[in-house]
Amino acid sequence: MKKDLHPEYHEATVTCASCGNTFKVGSTKENINVEVCSQCHPFYTGRQRFVEHGGRVEKFKKKYNMD
């Protein structure tokens, strides 16, 4: 392998915005934020749950000051 060609690979902390769960994975980034993880996603938990988050329309309105 060539030196100084590949990005550094280290342990990253993944943080869930919905439930606050954190876990460690290997990545080129140090911190990763996700909206839903396996601890709170309805597919994995088997129950319906409504998650409050900004959708694409809200992000667009915020970006162009259309509130």
Curated annotation (Swiss-Prot):
Record protein name field: Large ribosomal subunit protein bL31
Task of the protein: Binds the 23S rRNA.
Organism: Finegoldia magna (strain ATCC 29328 / DSM 20472 / WAL 2508)
Family matches, as Pfam families: Ribosomal_L31 (PF01197)
InterPro entries, alphabetized: Ribosomal_bL28/bL31-like_sf (IPR034704), Ribosomal_bL31 (IPR002150), Ribosomal_bL31_A (IPR027491), Ribosomal_bL31_sf (IPR042105)
GO molecular function: rRNA binding; structural constituent of ribosome
Gene: rpmE
GO BP of this protein: translation
Assembly with partners or alone: Part of the 50S ribosomal subunit.
Domain of life: Bacteria
Keywords recorded for this protein, A-Z: Ribonucleoprotein, Ribosomal protein, RNA-binding, rRNA-binding
Family under the similarity heading: Belongs to the bacterial ribosomal protein bL31 family. Type A subfamily.
GO CC annotation: ribonucleoprotein complex; ribosome
